Amino acid sequence: MSAKEKFTSLSPAEFFKRNPELAGFPNPARALYQTVRELIENSLDATDVHGILPNIKITIDLIDEARQIYKVNVVDNGIGIPPQEVPNAFGRVLYSSKYVNRQTRGMYGLGVKAAVLYSQMHQDKPIEIETSPANSKRIYTFKLKIDINKNEPIIVERGSVENTRGFHGTSVAISIPGDWPKAKSRIYEYIKRTYIITPYAEFIFKDPEGNVTYYPRLTNKIPKPPQEVKPHPYGVDREEIKILINNLKRDYTIKEFLVNEFQSIGDTTADKILELAGLKPNKKVKNLTEEEITRLVETFKKYEDFRSPSADSLSVIGEDLIELGLKKIFNPDFAASITRKPKAYQGHPFIVEAGVAFGGSIPVGEEPIVLRYANKIPLIYDEKSDVIWKVVEELDWKRYGIESDQYQMVVMVHLCSTKIPYKSAGKESIAEVEDIEKEIKNALMEVARKLKQYLSEKRKEQEAKKKLLAYLKYIPEVSRSLATFLASGNKELVSKYQNEISEGLFKLISKKLDLINIEEYRKVYRVDSE
């Protein structure tokens, strides 16, 4: 006789507490990295999205050597958090300000809460928050935990002090078990790669060993922030339609609903859609049956004349900032970038940007250095399972002038979208969506053509220099013959003319070879001859 099955439910907090690896917390090293990452991303979303030049300070301290507990503290100068929202923002899983139809670094309302859950599993210190919204006269402080069964914040302590220093922004400190020696290189790489695409930000990083690294602001130019937009009809399903209807504050007809609640639908398009769906324009939208909602969604999917989704919801890095960051960090001989035009997949707009840096101080390797970004987030882990890596690996770089298997090259790809198709909640690799993969390939080919042109011009220049260097060995003989002819047998004039002609020829070639002086030409000539 079989035992009875016991059925129960889990709160979101309990689920991710039981499955921390799904949120990017499988072990102490990854947990330390993921905590730093989540806090920095929150700080950037609180600054540049709102037109504030970011000043971000990151500190990691070892506070319990025996148990390897680290305290991660990130402070920003962002817009701050309304005090009434702080407990839920840090203590309720799947609660977020980022459930909007625009590009954001965060997506799930999970990140920092996953860090809090992991923290609670291994030690007893609460998360500490200090925040002050812009123009606030108070600085609000909180110490919080998460009630895992109820998925609710537990307020351990709260208070406020007078804001005498005009501070606005947020400070978050989390104590968490970590493995700094194993996480060190990843954390440094994450901050460096973040800095590459945010050269308008200032970062100060103090690690557990006491080392302080300063990343200075290189420009005051901030990319245009994304705007919240209405949903595109091609990207919605039945349940989203029902949510939109339930949230309506006006008693719309079906036609009014389509025109006012969706992008890419005007009066004419609405009439066509309703005719195809067999729905009456004047019927109240809240009276739609389940079957009618299904017909409407199916008509959306079949209709081929929608305008592409608006790109106002997206914020690109921009070609100037990409090249500025690549040049600052890698000091290459050549850097180029491209920002492609907006495209869409499944009704979600997206833009691909690509950059390449070549030569200079870039180390030589068997593979190019690949920098992957999604919504301005560096993707450090799971590189080989990402669609960006796949496209880079499959591209025939020899077509673009890379002739050997030794690469001295950095390849950068940024995908921004209202919905990044991540493979997991850890947000480290992008799935192989056909439309996105094709656009990444087009972007890389376009920027690779710029590299090919540079390499072609460089090779032509090198070949021309070789020819000019070959001419150097004939200068003594040519100058002597010309001097003898011009001097008409006068030995004193022969010597004088020969020196003048020789110097003149050296100077003529110097303009072509870009060497500093004649002695350098002669040195080059001697080395070349040897």
Swiss-Prot record:
It comes from the Archaea. Keywords: ATP-binding, DNA-binding, Isomerase, Nucleotide-binding, Topoisomerase. ATP binds at residues 42, 76, 97-98, 106-113, 427. The keyword Isomerase applies. GO terms for biological process: DNA topological change. It catalyses: ATP-dependent breakage, passage and rejoining of double-stranded DNA. SUPFAM superfamilies: ATPase domain of HSP90 chaperone/DNA topoisomerase II/histidine kinase, Ribosomal protein S5 domain 2-like, S13-like H2TH domain. Relaxes both positive and negative superturns and exhibits a strong decatenase activity. This is Type 2 DNA topoisomerase 6 subunit B. It comes from Saccharolobus islandicus (strain L.S.2.15 / Lassen #1) (Sulfolobus islandicus). The lineage of its organism: Archaea, Thermoproteota, Thermoprotei, Sulfolobales, Sulfolobaceae.
